[in-house]
């Protein structure tokens, strides 16, 4: 441990509630141990250009009460220093030039991967501690430990959906609500289950590629079942944004007006594709074509929860993580000193440090992603309370008759046999 080395901190990826609490706790603890803290603006963006001016020393005045605020006082960026070896080398050289011997990175899976590669390249010149942040909750933390920001995003999403459910009931129409989450359905399921939404669709329930027709079948079946068995024309369907990651590119490219773009880490820019509007259009067309129109309103939840003020859970949580990052850097523990880089987390209330090597996928070399386990009770309980077509609906003659009647109109009659043949694929397996 060298007391002359400074502690640097940067934020990568999308915003999440609690970022400023990490920066605040880290700054207070590092300064109490006689280390300067240098805040680095816009993630890796300037470091990988060799630019050392977008830095400021942080003191008490910079971070006072900032833990209550959403957003990031250091901004954030998706700049990827791992695309080119020379960019990563430039990051290391710039950190050395600034006298930064300890770097805390706050971010999700992409920032964690960049942090792991920097730690590997630095080989001890700069020790790196990653603080896991994402409202997607998809970093591979042990057990069911959430990433910070998730609980705040879930709470705000829950409140929005609660209001939409009341509007849906009052006006007699459906809402299709797409919830942010690039790969995993944690946030969508967390919101839908807590709010008691009519149904929630997540990518993990599909065993292969996701086809938009199959998603529309699920939605259409739910609308018909609610009408047939409860005489209700309203409902709220929560749909995970990450479904789009599983839709074949050629299928997306055939959709008029869709432009496929990727970010600096190679991910599909999901927010540029309005899945909620697309599904609304497709499902409304199905009902209109048989002469029984249905009213659907599309809504997206994501950006409005990312920079919200953190709830108490996240305020408390990130204070421990910010402290933990400094403790990783400056602890006298010889076992920690052996690690050039690690991810800090809380396990059973204790600070733990996970080696980056254990968090990378052995096949891809990239960060592993934590998906929703659809075999666990948490998902099965959520599914139990959804309104979706089930196997018994197609086997019960009375229910099947009511469903077929709901699917009929003056223009087009649907027999029980027709209905069963049409939707049987949803309940197989």
Predicted regions and their residues:
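C-terminal non-catalytic interaction/assembly regions of soluble proteins
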Residues: 252-255, 259-429
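Glycine-rich oxoanion-binding loops at beta->alpha junctions
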Residues: 1, 48-101, 111, 135, ...
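Accessory alpha-helical/coil subdomains and C-terminal extensions
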Residues: 37, 94, 102-107, 113-117, ...
């Amino acid at each position: 441990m060298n007391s002359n080395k400074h502690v640097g901190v940067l934020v990568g990826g999308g915003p999440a509630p609690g970022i400023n609490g990490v920066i605040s706790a880290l700054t207070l603890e590092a300064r109490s141990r006689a280390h300067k803290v240098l805040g680095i603006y816009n993630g890796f963006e300037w470091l990988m250009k060799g630019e050392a001016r977008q830095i400021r020393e942080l003191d008490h005045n910079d971070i006072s009460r900032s833990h209550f605020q959403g957003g990031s006082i250091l901004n954030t960026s998706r700049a990827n220093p791992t695309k080119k070896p020379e960019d990563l080398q430039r990051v290391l050289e710039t950190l050395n030039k600034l006298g930064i011997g300890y770097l805390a990175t706050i971010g999700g899976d992409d920032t964690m991967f960049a942090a792991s590669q920097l730690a590997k390249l630095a080989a001890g010149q700069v020790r790196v501690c990653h603080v896991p942040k994402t409202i997607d909750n998809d970093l591979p933390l042990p057990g069911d430990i959430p990433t910070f920001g998730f609980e705040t995003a879930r709470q705000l999403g829950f409140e929005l959906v609660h209001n939409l459910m009341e509007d849906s009931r009052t006006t007699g129409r459906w809402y299709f609500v797409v919830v942010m989450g690039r790969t995993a359905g944690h946030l969508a399921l967390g919101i839908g289950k807590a709010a008691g939404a009519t149904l929630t669709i997540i990518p993990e329930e599909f065993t292969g590629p996701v086809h938009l027709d199959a998603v529309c079948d699920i939605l259409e079946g739910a609308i018909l079942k609610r009408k047939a068995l409860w005489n209700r024309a309203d409902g709220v369907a929560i749909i995970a944004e990450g479904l789009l990651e599983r839709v074949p590119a050629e299928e997306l490219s055939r959709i008029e007006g869709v432009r496929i773009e990727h970010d600096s880490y190679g991910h599909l820019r999901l927010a540029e594709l309005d899945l909620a509007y697309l599904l609304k259009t497709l499902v409304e067309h199905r009902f209109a074509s048989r002469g029984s129109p249905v009213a659907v309103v599309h809504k997206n939840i994501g950006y409005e929860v990312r920079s919200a003020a953190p709830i108490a859970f996240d305020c408390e949580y990130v204070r421990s993580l910010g402290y933990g990052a400094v403790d990783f850097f400056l602890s006298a523990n010889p076992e920690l000193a052996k690690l050039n880089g690690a991810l800090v987390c809380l396990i059973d209330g204790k600070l733990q440090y996970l080696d980056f090597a254990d968090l990378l996928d052995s096949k891809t070399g990239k960060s592993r992603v934590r998906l929703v386990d659809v075999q666990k009770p948490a998902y099965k309980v959520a599914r139990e309370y959804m309104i979706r077509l089930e196997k018994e609906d197609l086997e019960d003659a009375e229910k099947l008759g009511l469903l077929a009647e709901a699917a009929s109109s003056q223009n087009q009659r649907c027999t029980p046999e027709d209905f069963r043949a049409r939707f049987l694929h949803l309940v197989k397996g």
